[in-house]
């Protein structure tokens, strides 16, 4: 009996009556942020590609000679959504001027990719739950950097070529 009593006495010293209070949650780059950050990077790349096509098309054309101007050049490709390239003839195919415009030229495809990637990242982030305000600020900084890296990767190489 004394052995059991001694065992229970020693066991009680090692048991805790209260749960440990979890420490402050730390901001980390987890799987969720990698996925959503990648989507935002793709959105930034699409935006940078659009800006390149719109403002530095000559440098883009010099870098990729022989490209299809009817697909890539926004000054020409906007006509792809119309029959015979003439707005007076009406749409080239059903919803080619609205819902399916992304299938008519690169400029509209880039816009679609940009919006789809941003919206996908947003939908994934909505399910995360509450967190400290500081984490929202860090998320804002993280996603801004992701977007700018994507933008810079597809825009600045062509601005450097066009200034030469």
Tell where the protein language model's regions lie, with residue ranges.
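Hydrophobic alpha-helical membrane segments
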Residues: 19-164
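Bacterial Sec-dependent N-terminal signal peptides
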Residues: 1-25
